[in-house]
Design a protein with these regions (language model features):
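N-terminal accessory scaffold of Fe(II)-dependent oxygenases
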Residues: 1-237, 245-311, 316-333
Length: 333
């Protein structure tokens, strides 16, 4: 009996070990595949190669229902999150700020500095019911034994870019729903030249380097990184494997629908990341970006109240002076 238990434990450990090694496997070949309308079986086989792939898949329901024009027309009063690309490594402040969609849209349209983009909008998708649209139309993309599905809508001001970062989910799909955007990819082995920053609070693993306009202090290291750069249009879906670095630069009025998936074994593989995330969210508090604005607004309100009080006091004094003058006037005889 003891022998049987030992064999069972050995088989269980071997099973877990092989699956973890499978999920940690990466490909560093600097090439991208293009596949037109594959079958589900072919689709799974290609994704398992862990190579970036553009699939010519036209999911009209997702494109029509989740493009930013349709979202803006239907849900303009709901809040979406916005982020400043220049503040990605300022740890003392909140990373995201919520704004009503119509206000956010105006900010992105008027942003001439290419600084703002919107992401991490899962709360918005749940409140508006758009998450159900993703759920009803993403069956083809879901891997076997899926445990977690994450959906998002990503957009930015003209020429704004996302941080240079990588994902640890088992599958990551990026589907343009409006406009055109440029993508830059780098293989996992590039990490030693990219000065990675592990932000467990936002569960983001990024580089301080801007791959579209490299800062002088990082130029010597980034010259060793080989990148793929290409355009992505509506009607295509990009698969980015885990641990591949990517950055997206937006064109005017463009938007992306994003679908990310984890499996049970994927969660086990990334459990150290998840554990660090759980610790981080309990131990860190950040200042809100709204604090400064609220303080300014409060100060303005106080100034207005002081002006109104001064005006009221002046009017009162004038009335008293008029009454005194009237009392001092002698009656006409």
């Amino acid at each position: 009996m003891k022998t049987i238990i030992n064999i069972f434990i050995f088989c269980l450990i071997l099973f877990v070990y092989l699956h973890i090694q499978y999920h940690l496997k990466t490909s560093n070949d600097l090439e991208i595949y293009e596949i037109e309308e594959p079958s589900k079986q072919k689709f799974e086989e290609i994704c398992d190669i862990r190579q970036p792939t553009i699939f010519q898949l036209n999911n009209e329901n997702l494109v029509n229902e989740t493009n930013i024009t349709n979202i803006l027309n239907k849900y303009y009063a709901f809040d979406m999150k916005i982020r400043n690309i220049n503040d990605i490594h300022k740890k003392e402040e909140e990373t995201y700020m919520s704004l009503p969609l119509h206000t956010l849209n105006k900010l992105l349209t008027d942003d001439n500095s290419a600084s703002y983009f919107s992401e991490n909008n899962s709360d918005f998708l749940k409140e508006t019911g758009v998450a159900k649209i993703f759920k009803y139309n993403d069956e083809f993309f879901r891997p076997h034994m899926v445990s977690n599905c994450y959906y998002d809508i990503l957009r930015g001001s003209d020429k704004c870019h996302t941080p240079f970062r990588y994902e640890i989910n088992h599958r990551n799909f990026f589907m343009p729903t409006q406009g055109t955007m440029k993508i830059k990819l780098a293989p996992p082995k590039s990490i030693k030249y990219l000065f990675p920053n592990y932000d467990y609070e936002n569960f983001e693993f990024s580089s301080p380097i801007n791959p579209w306009n490299v800062q002088p202090q990082y130029l010597s290291e980034f010259d060793k990184v080989k990148c793929l750069e290409f355009d992505l249009n509506v009607g295509c879906t990009l698969f980015i494997p885990p641990y591949w670095w990517y950055s997206i630069i937006f064109s005017e009025n463009s938007s992306l629908s994003i679908m990310k998936y984890r499996t049970y074994m994927n969660n086990l593989t990334i459990s150290p990341y998840i554990f660090m995330y759980a610790l981080q969210v309990q131990n860190i508090r950040r200042k809100s970006n709204n604090v400064k604005n609220i303080a300014i607004e409060s100060k303005n309100v106080e100034n207005v109240e002081n002006v109104e009080n001064n005006e009221a006091q002046n009017n009162k004094n004038e009335n008293e002076n008029v009454e005194n003058n009237e009392n001092n006037i002698e009656p006409y005889q």
